[in-house]
């Protein structure tokens, strides 16, 4: 009679894909958006429609496509737009 056992070295990898997609509690000030859609209502309802490999740091509802690289979009709505991600003075805000 013999007994065989496998030992698996499991560890938490903080740089894994899922931890990049989920909000990690970063400061909202670090969140950014290049393309923001807002309604004409007062106050406006705005949503970032950027598609990137990860959502911005303050995103609560991030949806990613199963692709390589992943294509993620944040579905949170706010009464404002985040600052532009890239160092350009042109921030695209589209009012519906």
Swiss-Prot record:
First and last residue of the signal peptide: 1-10
CDD domains, A to Z: BBI
Keyword list, A-Z: Disulfide bond, Protease inhibitor, Serine protease inhibitor, Signal
Site (Reactive bond for chymotrypsin): residue numbering on this chain: 66-67
Alphabetized GO MF terms: serine-type endopeptidase inhibitor activity
Disulfide bonds: 32-85, 33-48, 36-81, 38-46, 55-62, 59-74, 64-72
InterPro entries, per the entry: Bowman-Birk_prot_inh (IPR035995), Prot_inh_BBI (IPR000877)
Keyword Disulfide bond: yes
Record propeptide residues: 11-24, 88-96
Tissue-by-tissue expression: Seed.
Site (Reactive bond for trypsin): 40-41
Stretches assigned to coiled coil: none
Pfam family, one: Bowman-Birk_leg
Cellular-component GO terms for this entry: extracellular region
Function, as annotated: Inhibitor of trypsin and of chymotrypsin. May function as a natural phytochemical defense against predators.
Family of the protein in this entry: Belongs to the Bowman-Birk serine protease inhibitor family.
Name of this chain's protein: Seed trypsin/chymotrypsin inhibitor IVA
Record organism: Pisum sativum
Lineage, top ranks: Eukaryota, Viridiplantae, Streptophyta, Embryophyta, Tracheophyta
């Amino acid at each position: 009679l013999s007994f065989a056992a496998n030992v698996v070295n499991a560890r938490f990898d903080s740089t894994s894909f899922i931890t990049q997609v989920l909000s990690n509690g970063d400061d909202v000030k670090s969140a950014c958006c290049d393309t923001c859609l807002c309604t004409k209502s007062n106050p406006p309802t705005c949503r970032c429609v950027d598609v990137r490999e990860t959502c911005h740091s303050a995103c609560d509802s991030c949806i990613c496509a199963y692709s390589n690289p992943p294509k993620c979009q944040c579905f949170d709505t706010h009464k404002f737009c985040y600052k532009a991600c890239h160092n350009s003075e042109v921030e695209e805000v589209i009012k519906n």
